Amino acid sequence: MARTQAEPPASQPDARAAWLRDQLERANYAYYVLDQPDLPDAEYDRLFGELQQLETDHPDLVTPDSPTQRVGGEVAGGFTPVVHDAPMLSLNNGFADEDIAAFDKRVADALGKTTDLAGSVTDPVEYACELKFDGLAISLRYEHGVFVQASTRGDGTTGEDVTENVRTIRSIPLKLKGAHVPALLDVRGEVLMFKRDFARLNERQRAAEQREFANPRNAAAGSLRQLDPKITAQRPLSFFAYGIGVLDGMPMPDTHSALLDWYESFGLPVNRERAVVYGADGLLGFFRKVGEKRESLPYDIDGVVYKVNRRDEQDRLGFVSRAPRFALAHKFPAQEALTRLVAIDVQVGRTGAITPVARLEPVFVGGATVTNATLHNEDEVRRKDIRIGDTVIVRRAGDVIPEVVGALLERRPDDAAEFVMPTECPVCGSKIERLPDEAIARCTGGLFCPAQRKQALWHFAQRRALDIDGLGEKIIDQLVELNLVRTPADLFNLGFATLAELDRFAEKSAQNLLDSLEKAKHTTLARFIYGLGIRHVGESTAKDLAKHFGSLTPIMDASIEELLEVNDVGPIVAESIHQFFAEEHNRTVIEQLRAPGKVTWPEGPPAPKAPQGVLAGKTVVLTGTLPNLTRDAAKEMLEAAGAKVAGSVSKKTDYVVAGADAGSKLAKAEELGIPVLDEDGLHQLLEGNTP
């Protein structure tokens, strides 16, 4: 998109109105025609509201093509235009409680509702309340109960024919249920995509190496407006009916709630999250109830809709140019907003994960003022092409951490700077490393880094590590926050007086912890290695390292090639171990832990080198009775030669050694074509000769 003209100040209403019209029309085109929305709803609403106010204050600024005089965008090429028999109008918006009270008062006054001396309505208005779905509005046309046409809203007067695509939506009946159906019925409703279906669609997009959709609304709109209905058929779209256009051949239901019940009797999908309430208090009660469950709903909504329930009262209230007077959309606080990204810092997590964080000009979004937002990782920053100085879209939903969704490239300043991942931890100065095939970079100073301190201490004290009973998370929190412990080595410097002064820590608890620390000084090499918290080194790998090297120093000094010789240690684990011990800060803490009077363990000899003969790594099965060797003796000899002795025959078996009375294992070996040896053949293998 080309760069837009400079933003004129409010002191120039003519220029300001022209600029606002331009911004809104660009947004409409991107949303309705290109299916590539580039402006958050909150920003669109703000600009639209400003233009409305300008035109109210300066009526001479109103133009026939102003966005305030129509509903949406132009009809896209590739689809046949459809003129709606009844316009598909949008709704006016309300945001604050005061807006809802004012709406109720306008409606009550217009309907001549009676009030008491205090001005309160004694005969409150009856409203039908529904959800405001975040999808694409469409109209379904049924003739004598048979589905004949579907069209999008378009500009409210003329939409696009999407009949063949809508036929693929399984929730939409192609024929209405019941013996008595209208001669003509225009059903208004919303095409949307459920959250679970959206997640599955994006999984398929990733697997096919195709572009992912930003959100369910974009996915629904893009899927519905495919030129090839076969593509739409592969997309998991849903539909909810919520309104009516034209009806012929049957009387109109007396209320809106009755209309929705009527739709259900025809087999049309109608959302059950609806209610009939009275007055402003009833409206606000419904809004709050829905707000509490919003995040748990299986689909996205951006508010609720209020409609005067009685049809005769709707008719009395009528319409303004672009919206009905009898209805209002009550929108939740915007979940997306625009602001400027002023810097990108990195923060260090409890496990050493380095996360880029956007520092933002303050913006109100999702019900709170946001100044920071996560950028997840370096690859995400590159993929989204986010730069310092950009105007960015910030999203905050519920209690979810705010995130930067993307940048508006057309607003990018010439001096926008790319993000560069630091090479040293901003907290402790240790090296930042990123393992192959991992998206997250990490600080390698696990034992030393203050940001990882609590996690390192908690892991060190685990039952499978040093097993320091009584050192729980709450005690660790106090020790760290009072600056009594910086590294695991400091634990062994704690005294009774210090521990006894901790909050809610009695003298007996202090003594028990000291006894546990004294006991922890006598451990095993495997437990100590596990307690260091090396990434990808679990309890089993720690045992393998201890068994292979016998003592700690050879492990600390081992090359990646030497580490790869350890059982079940692959390239990623070897790289992680090597990085950990290459960091001087970690080696310093280990040296402190091994100081006199601290942690000790019995040293053992390194394991013998693995055999390299013809049996090394081979799988052998023993069956039957051998003339001179017991089965246990044969097994011991095979394992000493580097073979694995298995209990059953499979395609992975290399040899079967068969003696007298060999049974089904011999038959299975012959069936699979596996070499079968007698005792002499076994001895040849053990001597290094291939039989």
Curated annotation (Swiss-Prot):
User: Which Pfam family is one of this chain's hits?
Assistant: HHH_5
Choose any GO biological process term that the UniProt entry carries and state it: DNA repair
**Binding residues annotated for NAD(+), in chain numbering:** D41, A42, E43, Y44, D45, S90, L91, E130, R153, E190, K307, K331
Residues annotated as binding Zn(2+) are C425, C428, C443, C449
Q: What UniProt keywords apply to this chain's record, in alphabetical order?
A: DNA damage, DNA repair, DNA replication, Ligase, Magnesium, Manganese, Metal-binding, NAD, Zinc
Cofactor or coenzyme needed: Mg(2+); Mn(2+)
EC supergroup of this enzyme: ligase
Give the EC number(s) listed in the UniProt record: 6.5.1.2
Reactions catalysed, semicolon-separated, are:
NAD(+) + (deoxyribonucleotide)n-3'-hydroxyl + 5'-phospho-(deoxyribonucleotide)m = (deoxyribonucleotide)n+m + AMP + beta-nicotinamide D-nucleotide
Keyword DNA repair appears in the UniProt entry = yes
At the top level, the lineage of the source is Bacteria
Q: Where is the BRCT domain?
A: 610-691
Name a single GO cellular component: cytosol
What the entry lists under NCBIfam families is as follows: dnlj, PRK07956.1
Give the protein's function: DNA ligase that catalyzes the formation of phosphodiester linkages between 5'-phosphoryl and 3'-hydroxyl groups in double-stranded DNA using NAD as a coenzyme and as the energy source for the reaction. It is essential for DNA replication and repair of damaged DNA.
Member of which family? Belongs to the NAD-dependent DNA ligase family. LigA subfamily.
This protein is called what?
A: DNA ligase
The encoding gene is ligA
